[in-house]
């Protein structure tokens, strides 16, 4: 997992 990984930010915003 990259640094700053968050369970709420698993994908880039569309």
Swiss-Prot record:
Primary localisation category: secreted
A Gene Ontology biological process term: defense response
Keyword Secreted: yes
Location within or outside the cell: Secreted
Domain of life: Eukaryota
GO CC annotations on file: extracellular region
Keyword Secreted: yes
Cysteine disulfide links: none
Tissue specificity as recorded in UniProt: Expressed by the skin glands.
Gene Ontology molecular function terms on file: toxin activity
Alphabetically ordered keywords of this record: Amphibian defense peptide, G-protein coupled receptor impairing toxin, Secreted, Toxin, Vasoactive, Vasodilator
Job description of the protein: Induces smooth muscle contraction. May target bradykinin receptors (BDKRB).
Similarity comment: Belongs to the bradykinin-related peptide family.
Name the UniProt record assigns to this protein: Bradykinin-like peptide 3
Originating organism: Pelophylax nigromaculatus (Black-spotted frog)
Lineage start: Eukaryota, Metazoa, Chordata, Craniata, Vertebrata
């Amino acid at each position: 997992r990259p640094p700053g990984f968050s369970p709420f930010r698993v994908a880039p915003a569309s």
